[in-house]
Amino acid sequence: MERGQRKVRIGTVVSNKMQKTIVVAVEDKFRHPLYGKIVKRTKKYKVHDENNICNVGDVVKIMETRPLSKEKRWRLVEVIKKAE
């Protein structure tokens, strides 16, 4: 039996004040079904960062994983762009 593909998101680090955990904001754009306007929606994910390598402002790729704590279900895959 095949396991489904894990979800992958790209977002910006907004907090790194916890140990081995970062908060990543992922922006989603979609067209409103009735009015047709492009709407921006932001969702924040708590992400496991094993080596504490991320800083606020970094652009990162995250992947879905097994539950690591009450709210952590994502892990860091790579840092795409470091903050200046």
Swiss-Prot record:
An annotated GO BP:
translation
Task: Could you list this entry's UniProt keywords, alphabetically sorted.
Answer: Ribonucleoprotein, Ribosomal protein, RNA-binding, rRNA-binding
GO molecular function of the protein, one example?
Answer: rRNA binding
Pfam families per UniProt: Ribosomal_S17 (PF00366)
| Superkingdom, taxonomy of origin | Bacteria
What Gene3D superfamilies does the record point to?
A: Nucleic acid-binding proteins
Q: Name one GO cellular component term.
A: cytosolic small ribosomal subunit
Function description: One of the primary rRNA binding proteins, it binds specifically to the 5'-end of 16S ribosomal RNA.
What NCBIfam families does its record include? PRK05610.1, uS17_bact
Subunit composition and interactions: Part of the 30S ribosomal subunit.
Q: Could you say which protein family the record assigns here?
A: Belongs to the universal ribosomal protein uS17 family.
**The name this protein goes by in its record:** Small ribosomal subunit protein uS17
